[in-house]
């Protein structure tokens, strides 16, 4: 992942800083006064390389008054524009492309028509998001996107994310043929059927670009494989949705003999329930046609996930519509039931049908084995497929038994479709896991803020709202951003606790569940797409932005303060809102201590945002306890709050 620091200031504060920096004695007759755009560019560390770039920035300043914020990386690339992008509404993808054209000089794009092509148009409750891909000499650059976010109600383009790569060059002549690449794929994936290919430029970070063959297969779970077109190394295998033939004949299936209480796989003591199956000829198929959910099983009942890919022919079937004669049939029914619940959660809360919002076919594998043909203790998302291990059988039951585990894996498929984070490491990888945990917790609807409690048999039958001693991940345990800087080495799951603990604090601060989950889902509209792009700072900004979108009443400012307080709790700060920094100078010292003491004594009033910064122990109060904490910090007695 490219190491860089994003620099972002509001228009008002940046121009004030620039004015202070630029106020120097001028010789008599000098008239070369910096323009407003030049002042703003200087304040955020942006070098304007042309008059056209200056004009583009000037136009943005003119139409935004005080609402503009621009982010720039260390390579002088504009990565984000938060503010009104045009005075004209956006009603089509062509309009969105025109927005990019108007800012192309800032983004470093030489030829918009040649280098940028529409990839996707998606909608949430509040926004319409136009996603464009970058091309180089006619070849797609994988993981390089520009997104334009448009308010659905007003039609205003109000946000832009860019991972466009400028000043780029690579040899586009492959050293191996596509047939050689096909052979590599066939050797690894046991002769799966190949249905297409193209030549692309592949990158997982902004410093390592490779010419690659993208091989498309018709397998479920491995539908795109990237093969280095020079070395023949497999760079990545990835899943995208492919259209499959429709299935008809829907009927209701009810099974009261699923599992006994001692080996409970479903919550709330539910043992009789409905799932949808379909019938063709004399066979019944475990597939929910309306939701496009298909239960597939390994026909050998013994293979590990890494050694086979399911096809539609692997759908679980029965002659008598009694899917209860074996463990795998019972697991299949339970998986379909629980995934149906998660599907309905995303649909009812966000209008998001299926993993991709388009109700595309989704495959569920309930009987994955370990690499040693033993019982697998894990679960995976593979884009258009979910895979569940059966658990070790002694202390664990199926990993499909816990609704938040299914919500987690389903969430991976959703974020994979919306922001393409799959396979990322570092902070993006941590975000990928955090969002999955957050969605899983809200699907569970218990607010215990623990993932995977129900897979453990010792927790069976216990009150689901009480905290358990055994779980996969405990989101109530605080992890501070400033305590770990290398998020690659500590791993995605451990790093994810920074952001998932933020969600826990949003809940503790009183943001109700139906509002909070909409905030998190809507925040995906504002986050950078592609592998290894998004950071924790991006997440804070996106969640604050989403809060302003979701909460449209008088309580908006109160909710924004709560969200910022939750991020402060894990030390993911705004530049101007560091906890305890009441002087707003980016550091904690005796000057902040003086202001805090005055506030506690009642001789100085604080705004709601300042009160959130002054509440160092996060107890909802500003009192002597906060003074003691800050004093000990200033004296060097403690290093954290």
Where are these regions (language model features)?
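Cellulosome-associated attachment modules in secreted, modular CAZymes
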Residues: 8, 19, 23-30, 575-641
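Sec-dependent signal peptide hydrophobic core
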Residues: 5-16
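Zymogen propeptides/activation segments of proteases
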Residues: 2-7, 22-406, 413-576
């Amino acid at each position: 992942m490219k190491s860089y620091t994003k620099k972002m200031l509001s228009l008002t504060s940046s121009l004030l800083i620039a004015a202070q920096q630029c106020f120097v004695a001028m010789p008599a007759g000098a008239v070369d006064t910096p323009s407003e755009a030049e002042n703003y560019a200087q304040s955020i560390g942006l070098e304007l390389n042309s008059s056209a770039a200056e004009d583009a920035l000037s136009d943005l300043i003119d139409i935004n008054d005080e609402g503009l914020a621009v982010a720039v990386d260390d390579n002088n690339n504009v990565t984000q524009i938060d503010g009104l992008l045009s005075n004209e509404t956006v009603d089509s993808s062509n309009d969105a492309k025109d927005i990019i054209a108007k800012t192309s000089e800032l983004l470093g794009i030489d030829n918009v028509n040649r280098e940028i092509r529409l990839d996707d148009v998606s909608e949430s409750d509040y926004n319409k998001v136009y996603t464009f891909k970058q091309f180089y000499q006619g070849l797609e650059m994988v993981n390089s996107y520009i997104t334009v976010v448009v308010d659905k109600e007003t039609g205003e383009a109000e946000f832009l994310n860019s991972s466009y790569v400028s000043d780029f060059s690579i040899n586009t002549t492959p050293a191996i043929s596509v047939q050689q690449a096909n052979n590599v794929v066939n050797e690894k994936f046991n002769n799966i059927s190949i249905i297409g290919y193209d030549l692309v430029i592949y990158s997982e970070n902004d410093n390592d670009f490779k010419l690659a063959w993208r091989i498309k297969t018709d397998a479920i779970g491995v539908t795109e494989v990237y093969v280095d077109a020079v070395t023949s190394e497999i760079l990545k295998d990835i899943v995208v949705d492919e259209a499959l033939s429709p299935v008809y004949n829907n009927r209701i299936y009810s099974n009261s003999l699923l599992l006994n209480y001692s080996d409970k796989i479903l919550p709330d003591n539910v043992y009789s329930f409905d799932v949808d199956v379909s019938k063709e000829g004399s066979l019944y198929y475990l597939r929910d046609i309306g939701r496009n959910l298909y239960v597939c099983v390994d026909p050998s009942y013994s293979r590990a996930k890494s050694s086979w890919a399911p096809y539609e022919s692997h759908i679980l079937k029965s002659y008598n519509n009694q899917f209860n004669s074996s463990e795998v049939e019972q697991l299949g029914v339970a998986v379909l039931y629980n995934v149906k619940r998660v599907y309905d959660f995303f649909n009812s809360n966000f209008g998001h049908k299926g993993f991709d919002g388009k109700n595309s076919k989704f495959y569920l594998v309930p009987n994955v084995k370990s690499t040693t043909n033993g019982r697998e203790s894990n679960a995976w998302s593979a884009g258009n497929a979910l895979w569940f291990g059966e658990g070790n059988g002694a202390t664990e039951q199926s990993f499909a038994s816990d609704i938040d585990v299914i919500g987690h894996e389903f969430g991976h498929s959703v974020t994979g479709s919306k922001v393409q984070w799959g396979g990322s490491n570092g902070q993006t990888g941590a975000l990928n896991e955090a969002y999955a945990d957050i969605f899983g917790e809200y699907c569970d609807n218990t607010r215990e803020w623990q993932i995977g409690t129900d897979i453990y048999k010792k927790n069976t039958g216990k009150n689901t709202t009480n905290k358990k001693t055994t779980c996969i991940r405990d989101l109530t345990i605080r992890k501070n951003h400033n305590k770990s800087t290398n998020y690659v080495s500590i791993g995605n799951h451990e790093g994810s606790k920074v952001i998932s603990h933020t969600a826990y604090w949003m809940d503790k601060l009183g943001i109700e569940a139906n509002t909070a989950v909409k905030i998190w889902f809507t925040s995906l509209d504002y986050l950078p797409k592609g592998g290894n792009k998004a950071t924790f700072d991006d997440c804070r900004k996106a969640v604050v932005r989403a809060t302003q979108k979701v909460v449209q009443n008088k309580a908006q400012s109160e909710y924004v303060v709560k969200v910022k307080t939750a991020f402060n709790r894990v030390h993911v700060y705004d530049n101007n809102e560091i906890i305890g920094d009441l002087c707003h100078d980016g550091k904690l010292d005796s000057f902040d201590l003086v202001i805090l003491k005055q506030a506690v004594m009642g001789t100085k009033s604080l705004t709601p945002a300042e009160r959130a910064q002054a509440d160092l122990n996060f107890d909802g109060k500003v009192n002597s306890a906060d003074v003691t904490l800050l004093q000990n910090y200033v004296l060097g007695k403690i290093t954290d709050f």
